[in-house]
């Protein structure tokens, strides 16, 4: 989902990972061109939650189904239909708005496989549109915008032309660090990670100091995040700093600390402190 949104917006506003449930917050993203303005809500993936964080993520996704005009239901075309897909489609039965089926990763499929996938899903739900794409390569992504432009109701322009997201800089910085941690760690460790920007200070002369705390649930996870002689954390810091500098247009000193906050994903107070709270 996030790869598609970033491709449409033409900026990186959502972090990307091949791991499930990467997106935790609802992210508002804005596409503006000469003909229209389309507001997208990049939601956490709907799933059966295993902890309070998962419940928060599901609620954020369900809240996004209110006051919308179209749903984009995105699947990986090269993967078999699973119970998760059927679970989400069942939840969409009463949504009351058109649903587009977006078949992603068609660059990895034959024409016959694409046609079979379209037929398979058409039997499950009355989709308003079916659009095969490759979000990574950008193939047919323009068709998504074109079809949305046709079906969306006219309304006022809610945001300035140069605005692409409602996310504050601090949250964007935290998400960049979390994305790099996803890339550099393994197994279940990424899902036990939370990132919080403690301090973000302009020191003048185009230099910004940022202090970030990475929270994990166990001491063993802390050791993995830091790495032998700090190698993992150093790599995360270097990758994140480069992207944050591009985001802010400033030289950045990134100070990353790792702390253990035991079982934070199951504690409402900890979730709220870390910014995971629904409106």
Predicted regions and their residues:
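Conserved, well-folded catalytic cores of nucleic-acid-processing
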Residues: 7, 11, 30-34, 49, ...
């Amino acid at each position: 989902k996030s790869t598609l949104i970033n491709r449409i917006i033409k900026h990186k506003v959502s972090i990307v990972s091949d791991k499930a449930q990467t997106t935790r917050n609802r992210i508002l993203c804005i596409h503006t061109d000469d003909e229209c303005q389309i507001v997208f809500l990049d939601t956490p993936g709907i799933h059966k939650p295993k902890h309070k964080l998962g419940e928060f993520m599901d609620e954020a996704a369900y809240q996004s189904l209110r006051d919308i005009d179209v749903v984009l239901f995105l699947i990986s075309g090269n993967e078999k239909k699973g119970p998760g897909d059927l679970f989400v489609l069942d939840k969409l039965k009463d949504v009351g708005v058109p649903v587009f089926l977006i078949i992603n990763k068609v660059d990895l499929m034959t024409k016959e496989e694409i046609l079979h996938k379209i037929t398979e899903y058409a039997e499950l739900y009355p989709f308003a549109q079916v659009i095969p794409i490759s979000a990574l390569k950008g193939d047919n992504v323009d068709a998504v915008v074109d079809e949305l432009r046709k079906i969306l109701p006219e309304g006022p322009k809610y945001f300035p032309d140069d605005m692409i997201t409602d996310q504050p800089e601090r949250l964007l910085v935290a998400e960049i660090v979390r994305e790099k941690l996803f890339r550099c760690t393994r197994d279940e460790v990424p899902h036990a990670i939370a990132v919080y920007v403690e301090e973000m200070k302009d020191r003048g002369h185009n230099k910004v100091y940022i202090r970030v705390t990475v929270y994990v649930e166990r001491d063993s996870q802390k050791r993995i995040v830091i790495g032998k002689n700090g190698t993992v954390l150093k790599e995360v810091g270097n990758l994140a700093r480069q992207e944050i500098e591009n985001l802010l247009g400033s030289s950045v000193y990134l100070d990353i600390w790792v702390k253990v906050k035991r079982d934070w994903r199951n504690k409402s107070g900890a979730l709220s402190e870390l910014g995971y709270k629904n409106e």
